Amino acid sequence: MALTSFLPAPTQLSQDQLEAEEKARSQRSRQTSLVSSRREPPPYGYRKGWIPRLLEDFGDGGAFPEIHVAQYPLDMGRKKKMSNALAIQVDSEGKIKYDAIARQGQSKDKVIYSKYTDLVPKEVMNADDPDLQRPDEEAIKEITEKTRVALEKSVSQKVAAAMPVRAADKLAPAQYIRYTPSQQGVAFNSGAKQRVIRMVEMQKDPMEPPRFKINKKIPRGPPSPPAPVMHSPSRKVTVKEQQEWKIPPCISNWKNAKGYTIPLDKRLAADGRGLQTVHINENFAKLAEALYIADRKAREAVEMRAQVERKMAQKEKEKHEEKLREMAQKARERRAGIKTHVEKEDGEARERDEIRHDRRKERQHDRNLSRAAPDKRSKLQRNENRDISEVIALGVPNPRTSNEVQYDQRLFNQSKGMDSGFAGGEDEIYNVYDQAWRGGKDMAQSIYRPSKNLDKDMYGDDLEARIKTNRFVPDKEFSGSDRRQRGREGPVQFEEDPFGLDKFLEEAKQHGGSKRPSDSSRPKEHEHEGKKRRKE
């Protein structure tokens, strides 16, 4: 069995199979067709109302002049449709040049590598080939100089073209040419056998526009290739993802023009404090550990102190019970009449025990002094045999407290002030103060009054004369005016308006600035007769 029997049928046919199938179909249609369907135009004289529209309507001829309709035989004169399809090009070997697709929209001088041979390195058959040798120093310098000159020329031309005003180009130097005419003789060339011609470049107008178009339109290059799709196929977005994609609005800590109510959690989220990583110093752990250790030691010390206090209380209790037991024993013996002969011996033994106890305390004190710090030891030794009178601080009141309330006796038995009872109980009389403050002196004499010698250094000795000088007084007064009279006495005196100024102002206000008052204001003259003007 062949291998093709196990393979599935192809979904697409190759080019050869398509051509063979098309050829077979055409043969079958040629065999089955009985009548040829050839379309020809109607004969002359029967073309009324007939309009040629297809290429078959024209037959083998051209247009029909008697039919006044736009006609395009063989599609001549018809506008061709614009297409971006490229024409197939072949190389010298007859192979299709597929690099035309890559060259579309690029300049003709651009090098495009589109073949496999462009990727394969060339094999060097002869290492001594002069084309593969490095150039010498002279060739490098020559090429460098040519390149520099060409670049300078190009740059200078571009800079000069960009400037709004430029100078005329420098003319080339004059050339001298020796000319020998072909016709020799006295009748030709003024009898001269040779001539020297001086050729000079014609001066060019710098403002003349260019005569020829040297720019070549290049088709637009292809766009950038599309970005590759490298994500998974689309799936339905979940509610959680939608909530995660919600972008919170911009929340400002200073402005809220709309007056929205913003929750605190949203404001803190907008503040960005939760995004910052909190770095805790290791000293916090050390402090917590130290506090824990100090607390534990304090608890242990309190517990130990409580145990010592309990033991001391137990010893005191036992000692008290022993003392009570001895007292009870002595009382029983005294009632029984038994005399104790050891009382004297007990008293001497007690004195010896007290002396022994005092010496033990002194030795303990000396040991504590020897173990104490130097500064504390010196302080204790200094205060050891000090007189008690030195401890008293001089100039400090005695802080002895007394339960009795002390009063100042100078405040009692006074006939004036609050203790006198407001003039013997007569509260209608306002005589709380028995005399005026500051002895009844004028306050204006002592307040805002500079001293006499304050401005003496600035104005000199004529300060009083300057003060007494009448300022703002005209040199020549009006007749009838008396400047010597003092201020007015009595109430202000008024007199009637003799010139009618009040009436004039009132009419001007009523008419709103009109040039001539109306007749309606004339009957009101009696209202202004009672007006009075203030006289100063």
From Swiss-Prot:
Keywords: Acetylation, Isopeptide bond, mRNA processing, mRNA splicing, Nucleus, Phosphoprotein, Spliceosome, Transcription, Transcription regulation, Ubl conjugation. There is a cross-link at residues 23, 81, 97, 115, 122, 141, 158, 170, 193, 240, 258, 286, 339, 344, 416, 441, 452, 509 (Glycyl lysine isopeptide (Lys-Gly) (interchain with G-Cter in SUMO2)). Its main location: nucleus. Residues 174-339 are annotated as: SNW. GO terms for biological process: intrinsic apoptotic signaling pathway in response to DNA damage by p53 class mediator; mRNA splicing, via spliceosome; negative regulation of transcription by RNA polymerase II; positive regulation of mRNA splicing, via spliceosome; positive regulation of neurogenesis; positive regulation of transcription by RNA polymerase II; positive regulation of transforming growth factor beta receptor signaling pathway; regulation of retinoic acid receptor signaling pathway. GO terms for cellular component: nuclear matrix; nucleus; U2-type catalytic step 2 spliceosome. Signal peptide: none annotated. The modification N-acetylalanine is found at residue 2. The modification Phosphoserine is found at residues 14, 182, 190, 224, 232, 234, 446, 479, 481. One of its GO terms (molecular function) is transcription corepressor activity. Residues 469-489, 503-530 have a biased composition (Basic and acidic residues). Residues 59-79 are annotated as: Interaction with PPIL1. Residues 1-46, 209-234, 311-386, 469-536 are annotated as: Disordered. Pfam families: SKIP_SNW (PF02731). InterPro entries: SKI-int_prot_SKIP, SKI-int_prot_SKIP_SNW-dom. Identified in the spliceosome C complex. Associates with U4/U6-U5 tri-small nuclear ribonucleoproteins (U4/U6-U5 tri-snRNPs). Component of the minor spliceosome, which splices U12-type introns. Interacts with SKI, SMAD2,SMAD3, RBPJ, RB1, PABPN1, MAGEA1, SIRT1, FOXN3, U2AF2, PPIL1, DAXX and ATP1B4. Interacts with VDR and RXRA; preferentially associates with VDR:RXRA heterodimers. Interacts with NCOR2. Interacts with MAML1. Interacts with NOTCH1 NICD; the interaction involves multimerized NOTCH1 NICD. Forms a complex with NOTCH1 NICD and MAML1; the association is dissociated by RBPJ. Involved in pre-mRNA splicing as component of the spliceosome. As a component of the minor spliceosome, involved in the splicing of U12-type introns in pre-mRNAs. Required in the specific splicing of CDKN1A pre-mRNA; the function probably involves the recruitment of U2AF2 to the mRNA. May recruit PPIL1 to the spliceosome. May be involved in cyclin-D1/CCND1 mRNA stability through the SNARP complex which associates with both the 3'end of the CCND1 gene and its mRNA. Involved in transcriptional regulation. Belongs to the SNW family. This is SNW domain-containing protein 1. It comes from Pongo abelii. The gene is SNW1.
